[in-house]
């Protein structure tokens, strides 16, 4: 299991969240994700520490990375002094600016930690949210949290460097990234 992402400025108390562009969800029912390794129906949640992974429109491809205890100083240079970096392609910038993204706070008693991925939680039962939070300015959230939002023309060169390094990382919706370019 990967090391958890580092704390961010203004990180609130531990809670579990489901992030969506749909602000009308009244109940989350277990389902089988098309990207999950398991065929068991589940409800997914993310903890507060990893909530910034979802400060994006759902389909936005993104690469997140941070140092781990075993990260070499050479690999840490990819962070360029940041504690945590979230990278997106420039073609998504306007969609990030205009997206309306909400976070549903979920009851922790229904969830258990995902044994495969740190920061993620699973429930086998239907879950009703406790609270709906409008995330607002997604770019501003990154700035306030001191998370570097790195804008690149194509994610693949950076992604390839990160996954070949000793950094910890997460990639979401990478299938939506621009095509790889010839090297």
Sequence positions of predicted segments:
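ADP-ribose/NAD+-binding catalytic cleft of ART/PARP-like enzymes
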Residues: 1-40, 55-57
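Short, well-structured hydrophobic secondary-structure segments
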Residues: 42-66
């Amino acid at each position: 299991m990967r090391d958890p992402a580092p704390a961010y400025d203004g990180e609130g108390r531990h809670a579990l969240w489901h992030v969506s562009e749909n602000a009308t969800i009244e109940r989350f029912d277990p389902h089988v994700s098309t990207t999950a390794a398991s065929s068991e129906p589940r409800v997914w949640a993310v903890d507060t520490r990893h909530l910034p992974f979802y400060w994006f429109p759902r389909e936005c491809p993104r690469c997140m990375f941070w140092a781990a205890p075993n990260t070499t100083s050479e690999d840490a240079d990819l962070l360029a002094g940041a504690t945590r970096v979230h990278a997106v392609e420039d073609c998504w910038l306007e969609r990030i600016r205009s997206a309306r993204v909400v976070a549903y706070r979920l009851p922790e008693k229904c969830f258990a930690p995902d044994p495969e991925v740190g920061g993620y939680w699973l429930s086998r039962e239907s879950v009703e949210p406790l609270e709906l939070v409008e995330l607002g300015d997604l770019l501003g959230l990154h700035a306030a949290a001191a998370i570097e939002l790195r804008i690149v023309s194509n994610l693949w060169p950076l992604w390839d460097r990160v996954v070949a390094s000793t950094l910890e990382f997460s990639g979401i919706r990478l299938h939506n990234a621009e095509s790889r370019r010839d090297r």
